[in-house]
Amino acid sequence: MTLPQIDASQSCDAVVVGAGPNGLAAAVKLAQAGLSVTVFEARSTVGGGVCTSELTLPGFQHDVFAAVHPLGIASPFLRTLPLAEHGLEWIHSPAPLAHPLDDGTAVMLERSVEATAQNLEKDARAYKKLVEPFVKHWDDLAGDVLRPLSLPSHPLQFSRFGLRAIRSASGLAETVFGGPRARALFAGLGAHSIMPLDRLGSAAIGLVMCAAGHAVGWPIAKGGSQRIGEALAAYLRTLNGEIVTGATIDSIEMLPKARVILLDVTPWQLLRMVRGLPDGYQRKLKRYRYGPGAFKVEWALDGPIPWRAADCRRAATVHLGGTLKEIVQAESGIWRGRHTDKPFVLLTQQSLFDPTRAPEGKHMAGAYCHVPNGSGVDMTAHIEAQVERFAPGFRDRIVKTHKLPPSELERLNANCIGGDIAGGIQNLRRLLQTSLRGSPYATPVGGVYVCSSSTPPGAGVHGMCGYHAAVAALRRLS
């Protein structure tokens, strides 16, 4: 649906395009400052990357994109908002994460560092030495990590983190740990970077996800991830913010007059939406690199997944990929344009802990793997084979399957170019390029800002890209 012609007499202080977590966070911050704000969203519902739908059968509530939210509950901005008053309830599984192995056991990321370490045999001491400082000072670390690269507020803690984060995930795992269990666990955590695990900087996301699991958990949203967007939207309305859905904005010239415009879009979309950008800036946008895509599968099940390792039933998130070596090979191949028969699979089983997700006596689950950007290869059989590998009899539980290839993810969310759910490559080069400018959010067109996950601090349902972009806009207005 295209936005109807807008009355030229309409105006407001701020306009935001895109009602995903970053767009809504930006709108909330602007409204808190007393600005009149209007948000335009192309889809009929708010949420962007946090949406929930009955993809398989009636009564089965599937998270279409993001499903588990360690950075949502940890967000320095979102946690200051009264989202619980507007329907957001976090549910924690007993353990944040399970990583089953072929020997029939599972490596568990527990809420307790000590309990996790005990599961790592001879690497218990090394694990505690690596992780405990970050967990102890989690709030300080999160505050510095979830913002543009700058002088840290807590230099001692950040330097300790940075010395390890700058390393490759595989290099850190092989140096710090001697056994296969700890190495496999960290490989799975590092794979959230969507980078080759032997590339510098890939350890950073692994460390953040690990520390978050201990400090704040990896919760799911009761009723579905959609509740996050709905709660943000509801709170925005209490601040007199307006949201217009079903409004596709192809050009900022379609928008009402405003003092500032914030765009929750990626660089290629920005290029199409804004006229008059300097040639050099246009060339930079055209050179912007998107990362691998995702191939996602959702299942309606007639019972819980029959894991060989019973511990897997204690975690809402399960990593399926086996050893460090297997995961490194799978993720590296994606960057060379290859598909693997044994992909690293990130699986969520929300209905084990949230009964609102499936009809009584039934269950749902979802999983995805990384694929080359824009891939047209159907990975369903390979994903299901990885589940079956650690849960024999899984296929017999499937009632209905729904596939979400990269093309469908992009159709449902225009920011997912080629199925890239992160908004671009999340590597050190991009971090430095975007953070060493005067502002990574401001464009050369006065009053126009970008607030998507293509800006620092990058991917994740934390709203901090939107928050920092709004702060930059407010600074200009003042």
Regions found by a protein language model. Give the residues of each.
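Active-site-proximal substrate-binding core of FAD-dependent oxidoreductases
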Residues: R476-S478
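N-terminal glycine-rich phosphate/pyrophosphate-binding loop and immediately adjacent elements
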Residues: I6-D139, I425
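Helical element adjacent to the flavin cofactor pocket in flavoenzyme catalytic cores
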Residues: V208-D250
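Rossmann-like flavin
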Residues: D102-L200
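A glycine-rich dinucleotide-binding beta-alpha-beta segment and adjacent secondary-structure elements
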Residues: G179-P196, D341-L346, G393-P456
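A conserved FAD-binding loop/helix module that cradles the flavin
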Residues: C451-L474
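Mid-domain catalytic core of redox enzymes
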Residues: G241, T245-A358
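Conserved FAD/dinucleotide-binding core of flavoprotein oxidoreductases
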Residues: A115-Q118, W268-V274, A300-D302, P359-Q386
